[in-house]
From Swiss-Prot:
This is Small ribosomal subunit protein eS17. Gene3D superfamilies: Ribosomal protein S17e-like. The lineage of its organism: Archaea, Methanobacteriati, Methanobacteriota, Stenosarchaea group, Halobacteria. NCBIfam families: PRK01151.1. One of its GO terms (molecular function) is structural constituent of ribosome. The keyword Ribonucleoprotein applies. Coiled coil: none annotated. It comes from Halobacterium salinarum (strain ATCC 700922 / JCM 11081 / NRC-1) (Halobacterium halobium). Keywords: Ribonucleoprotein, Ribosomal protein. GO terms for cellular component: cytosol; ribonucleoprotein complex; ribosome. Belongs to the eukaryotic ribosomal protein eS17 family. The gene is rps17e. InterPro entries: Ribosomal_eS17, Ribosomal_eS17_CS, Ribosomal_eS17_sf. GO terms for biological process: translation. SUPFAM superfamilies: Rps17e-like.
Amino acid sequence: MAIKPDYVKKTGNILMERYQDAFSREDFEHNKDAVTELTNIESKNVRNRIAGYITHKRN
């Protein structure tokens, strides 16, 4: 497993602190949609990395 970039960790941690109830423990697709709604990130790759990081941290 690769080490996540700093911006993925920082953004993921901020989102988990502010919107804890918006994310699911095991559902990557739900977390991906939540990241899309809560941020203005346009890059699909970055959005998926952040959603994957949040899913990993919630488990």
